[in-house]
């Protein structure tokens, strides 16, 4: 999706200039912490279960107990709505933390803490998912079969942002509604009239 910046005041900013922090534990594993996964507990979010637009809690589900969580995440608790980004295999998936359950940020996935005086979590998710940004990421990605992005790559990414936070909210809400409509039509095939044989078929 391409945003039309004609009718409101937008600006172009480098991604890293609108962030207060990047939460990045990509090299961390239970083994390196001399601990192990548990049967239940805090779900780990990785590039396998962070999909484009949502978190699939059933895929590659690993859990950590309270001790593993505290050692791993320290004081960087993820919060509802925070933007997640997969850096490799697959590269460029964008989703938001679905609730305030304490998740473990795991393999090939990072989380952004935006400067909320400049950009909202919701709009950050929207603009990172947009086709323009995704194409820029692909063009700048390194690696062979498994493309990936480094922090240097992220520093080169530019975002088109409304200067008004209320305008960001409007755009985010519109995109959310459009996504819900698209998902609804994908999940519920509708009947249409077949003009050739006079019957009906699934479209």
Tell what function each PLM region has.
Residues 16-19, 32-69, 112:
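DNA target-recognition patches
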Residues 17, 169-181, 185-186:
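Extracellular/lumenal glycan-associated surfaces
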Residues 46-47, 60-129:
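A short beta-sheet element
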Residues 87, 103-110, 142-167:
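A short glycine-rich beta-alpha junction/loop motif
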Residues 1-12, 187-203:
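Short amphipathic coiled-coil heptad-repeat segments
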Residues 4-28, 165:
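Non-catalytic DNA-recognition/assembly elements of restriction-modification systems
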Residues 10-14, 157, 161, 175-177:
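Long, compositionally biased tandem-repeat segments
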């Amino acid at each position: 999706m391409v945003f039309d910046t004609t009718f409101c005041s937008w600006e172009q900013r480098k991604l890293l200039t609108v962030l207060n922090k990047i939460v990045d534990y990509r090299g961390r594993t239970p083994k390196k912490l001399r601990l192990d996964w548990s049967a239940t507990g805090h779900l780990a979010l990785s590039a396998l279960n962070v999909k484009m637009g949502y978190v699939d809690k059933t895929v590659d589900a690993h859990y950590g107990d309270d001790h593993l969580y505290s050692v791993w995440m320290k004081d960087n608790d993820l919060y509802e709505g925070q933007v997640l980004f997969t850096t490799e295999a697959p590269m460029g998936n964008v989703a938001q933390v679905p609730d305030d359950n304490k998740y473990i940020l795991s393999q090939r996935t990072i989380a952004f803490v935006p400067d909320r005086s400049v950009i909202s979590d919701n709009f950050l998710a929207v603009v990172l998912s947009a086709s323009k940004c995704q194409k820029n990421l692909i063009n700048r990605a390194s690696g062979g079969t498994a493309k990936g992005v480094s922090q240097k790559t992220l520093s080169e990414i530019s975002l088109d942002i409304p200067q008004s936070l209320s305008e960001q909210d409007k755009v985010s809400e519109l995109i959310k509604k459009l996504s819900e409509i698209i998902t609804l039509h994908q999940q519920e095939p509708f009947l249409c009239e077949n003009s050739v044989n006079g019957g009906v078929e699934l479209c």
